[in-house]
């Protein structure tokens, strides 16, 4: 399968080729429901994670969700949270029939691209010990040195880390104000507020 990563275009209803994986930022309630459905299948169904541990209060607290689709079907999801000097990779989830490389790799690549564009130089994750070698093979994500394994939700975890290189046009405090206002991941194209800037200021109450 070949991965098609698309953070700048909304999902198109036209069916994609079977082998294509398309990753987009979740922008609608329907997108988020798809991510929640996938996570429910994998974490609650397969790993028997309790509901209140899987849905931990962080899904609406400044998080960005990515959705992977093959054609019109959601097949994977991932959550990103943003801290002062690092991004946090969470809830990487792939449907059982789509595991094997292309879908998780597409989600990871999209997460790295998005975090780097936001100016982050490090992305950290909490990875189940059994999955750490797979993450290293797929995306060169390494285990943090000097950090002890830890346990939550019945699994043993390690901290993993990947260094990122922000692009020259990464978002900074000095970026154009209208660029900063654009939808997440769509900073290179005019948004609705760009269009509104063509109207003269009337300063209505």
Regions found by a protein language model. Name each.
Residues 62-66, 87-90, 156-160:
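Short beta-strand micro-motifs in enzyme catalytic cores
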Residues 55-61, 150-153:
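A short beta-turn/loop motif at secondary-structure boundaries
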Residues 126, 141-163:
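Conserved catalytic-core motifs of GNAT/GCN5-like acyltransferases
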Residues 39, 134-140:
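Conserved active-site tyrosine of GNAT-family acetyltransferases
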